[in-house]
């Protein structure tokens, strides 16, 4: 029993982080835009209205602040580990160095769920806006081709096709993908700027009363959670993506300097934008009217700016495209790192000689996510994402403290300030947000982790590179 425990807790020395075979071409600006591209999307364009209508009311601004603080603590921890440990794979690589192999496997398995489900879920949202845009142009798609079977259709074809299109983009190479991302980020930031400018002149602060109609936290008879803290657990999804910057560490020109900057700059920018947009949106209409698919565009329409509503719908399509692109990118790099370490089949580690991209991983995951997006409804896809992300953040915050204790001699180009205070606050706040999630999310998450442990003990523990050493 003891040898088994020792085997599962073996750690990967930081010195073992091998020289990258990936192309090092991303600057600090590229990484910051990568983060903004991943973060600004579903949250600001959809979740703001839903959380205001069903969870927090106008106090959704407080929900964004609480969720943003939890993410800020975790982001600083990500930045320290990215600068210290390196190696693509995000929280997976950091956990391998800090906690040991089995925890790294659990985190990696968890991140595969998080990123894969996120891409498929966002593709569903993208498909809805795309279908609406085609209808507005007089070319509606048949309902059978825009809804999953559970929603009365045959297949959500636009959702599947956008993932396959992004698959081709990633196969071309990461720099081309970064250029597309930069262009899309510009479009959606322009869209948000237009909304802020127009909304600022049409505020009605009487809509902020009552400010906290659902209080801080409560559980309804049907099991639904409401209140500011429940809203924070929901809008937390809006921040998912900044950690994708840390998966790009092997493709950064100066990873120790630029990856922490990319993480922190993108999160600060997006947090400020979220709070401003949430405050303005809830001042335009009564909060209970905002539970629609496109609350920002809907609000513009209600106050008489139809042209702005059309522009915002275009921005939504651009915004959700970049979210999918960056999360898809992060997913492939995590699987690449796990394959390189022997925990997943080595064939997934293969790089295309011309583009230096993991084409096999990109293709396999793209096809699987396209199938999920085409045949599984949005609500079922999105339920698992938050709890998996929060679990990874808890381990990253703990990993900072553990690695400082285990390897104090390591060079740390970036160090989280105030000692263990911020990692502790990050660990506690992310754990608290997990508690506010519904029981069904915990049950499904548990099933996924059990499946992962079966794979680990049947395959990964024997094929691990550390086992061969």
Show where each model-derived region lies.
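Extracellular loop-to-transmembrane helix junctions
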Residues: 44-148, 266-276, 445-453
């Amino acid at each position: 029993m003891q040898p088994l425990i020792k085997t599962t807790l073996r750690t990967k020395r930081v010195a073992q982080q091998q020289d990258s075979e990936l192309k090092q071409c991303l600057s600090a600006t590229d990484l910051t835009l990568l983060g903004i591209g991943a973060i600004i999307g579903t949250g600001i364009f959809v979740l703001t209205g839903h959380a205001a209508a069903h969870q927090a009311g106008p106090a959704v601004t407080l929900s964004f602040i609480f969720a943003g603080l939890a993410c800020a603590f975790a982001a600083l921890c990500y930045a320290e580990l990215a600068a210290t440990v390196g190696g693509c794979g995000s929280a997976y690589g950091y956990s391998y160095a800090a906690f040991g192999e089995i925890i790294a496997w659990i985190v990696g398995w968890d991140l595969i769920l998080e990123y894969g489900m996120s891409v498929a879920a966002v593709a569903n949202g993208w498909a809805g806006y795309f279908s609406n845009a085609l209808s507005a142009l007089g070319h509606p798609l048949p309902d059978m081709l825009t809804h999953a079977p559970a929603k009365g259709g045959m297949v959500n074809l636009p959702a599947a096709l956008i993932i396959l299109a992004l698959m081709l983009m990633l196969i071309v190479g990461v720099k081309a993908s970064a250029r597309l991302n930069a262009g899309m980020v510009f479009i959606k930031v322009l869209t948000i700027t237009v909304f802020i400018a127009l909304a600022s002149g049409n505020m009605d602060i009487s809509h902020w009363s009552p400010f906290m109609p659902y209080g801080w936290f409560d559980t309804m008879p049907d099991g639904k959670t409401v209140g500011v803290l429940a809203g924070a657990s929901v809008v937390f999804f809006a921040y998912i993506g900044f950690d994708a910057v840390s998966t790009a560490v092997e493709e950064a020109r100066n990873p120790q300097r630029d990856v922490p900057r990319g993480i922190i700059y993108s999160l600060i920018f997006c947090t400020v934008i979220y709070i401003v947009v949430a405050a303005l949106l809830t001042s335009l209409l009564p909060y209970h009217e905002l539970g629609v698919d496109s609350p920002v565009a809907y609000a513009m329409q209600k106050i008489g700016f139809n042209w702005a509503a059309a522009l915002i719908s275009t921005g939504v399509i651009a915004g959700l495209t970049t979210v999918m692109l960056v999360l898809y990118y992060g997913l492939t790099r995590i699987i690449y790192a796990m394959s390189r370490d022997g925990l997943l089949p080595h064939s997934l580690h293969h790089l295309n000689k011309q583009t230096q991209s993991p084409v096999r991983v990109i293709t396999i995951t793209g096809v699987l996510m396209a199938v999920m997006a085409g045949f599984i409804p949005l609500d079922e896809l999105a339920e698992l994402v938050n709890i998996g992300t929060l679990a990874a953040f808890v381990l990253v915050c703990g990993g900072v403290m553990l690695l400082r204790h285990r390897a104090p001699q390591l060079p740390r180009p970036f160090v989280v300030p105030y000692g263990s205070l911020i990692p502790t606050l990050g660990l506690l706040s992310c754990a608290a947000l997990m508690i506010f999630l519904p029981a069904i999310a915990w049950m499904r998450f548990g099933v996924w982790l059990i499946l992962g442990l079966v794979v680990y003990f049947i395959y990964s523990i024997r094929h691990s590179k550390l086992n061969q050493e």
